[in-house]
Amino acid sequence: MPFDLQGKKGLVVGIANEHSIAWGCARAFRSAGAELAVTWLNDKARPFVEPLAHELHAPIQMPLDVEQNGQMEAVFDAIGDRWGRLDFLLHSIAFAPTADLHGRVTDSSREGFARAMDISCHSFARMARLAEPLMKGGGSLLAMSYLGAEEVISNYGLMGPVKAALESSVRYLASELGPQGIRVNAISPGPLATRAASGIQHFDQLLADAAQRAPLRRLVSIDDVGALSTFMASDASRSMTGSTLYVDAGFHI
C-alpha cells in the first residue's frame, strides 16, 4: 500500500538532474501527494533542476548554496510565508575538494576538511534549526549518508569521516528534537550512478563489485531510495528516529 503524504509540505535539497537520489525521492514524495519546495545550487545548475521542479509542480523554487550567507534563511522564510509550516525535509548534498576526496585522509587539508564538513554535515544541523519552528506539530528530517561512514571504502577518502559525522549528528538531533515530535534519520543507499558519485575514482568497478557483494545480487535505484524516503516522511514511520536505514540490497552486511 503506498504511503500517504496528502496535505504534507516538504523541502527537497540536492536535486542536480534526473539521475539524482534527491530526484528519485522528490518524485516519490509528489506521487504520494506531498507539495514540495525545491532548490538548485546556482545559476549553472538551474537549467537542469528547474524543469524537474516544474514537473513536480513545486510552488517554491529557489537557489540554495549552503556556503552563501542568507540563502538558506531565505528558503525557510519563503516556506514560512507560503505554508506556515514544514512537515519533512530531505538533505541530499555532499562535497569534498577533489584532492581531499582522492587522497589519503592523513594528508587532507585543513581547509578541505572544514569545507567538506560545512557543506555535507553542518548544513544539515543548520536546516534542522531553521525547520524546528516550522514543525510545531512534529515532522521528519532525512539526511543521505553512505556505507563509507562506517567502513573504509576505497577512493571515498575524506567523505568517510564526514558522513560518519553526519550520522552522529542525526542521533544528536534526534535526541534534541524528539520532545517536539521531530524525527531525524539517515538513509544509506547502496552505490548509485549519480553525478556526485562520478567524482569517485574507479566508481564503475565499485558498482560492479557492489552488485556481486550484495546478497540480492543487484544494485538499487533512485526509486528504491524514494520509496524508503516516502515511508520515512510519512506517519507510518512515526515511531522511528535516530537511525541509519540501509537501502542497498544488503550491501552493508
Language model segments and positions:
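Conserved mid-core segment of classical short-chain dehydrogenase/reductases
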Residues: 53, 62-73, 77-82, 91-114, ...
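Canonical Rossmann dinucleotide-binding motif of NAD(H)/NADP(H)-dependent dehydrogenases/reductases
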Residues: 2-38
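A short hydrophobic alpha-helix cap/turn motif
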Residues: 30, 84, 135-136, 175-180, ...
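Catalytic loop of short-chain dehydrogenase/reductase
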Residues: 14-21, 94-129, 137-179, 191-193, ...
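A glycine/serine/threonine-rich, flexible loop-to-helix segment
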Residues: 1, 50, 158, 179, ...
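Conserved SDR Rossmann-fold cofactor-binding beta-strand/turn motif
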Residues: 183-193, 233, 246-248
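C-terminal substrate-recognition "lid" of short-chain dehydrogenase/reductases
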Residues: 4, 84, 134, 218-247, ...
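Short, small/polar-rich loop/turn modules that mediate ligand/substrate recognition or access, typified
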Residues: 178, 183, 240-242
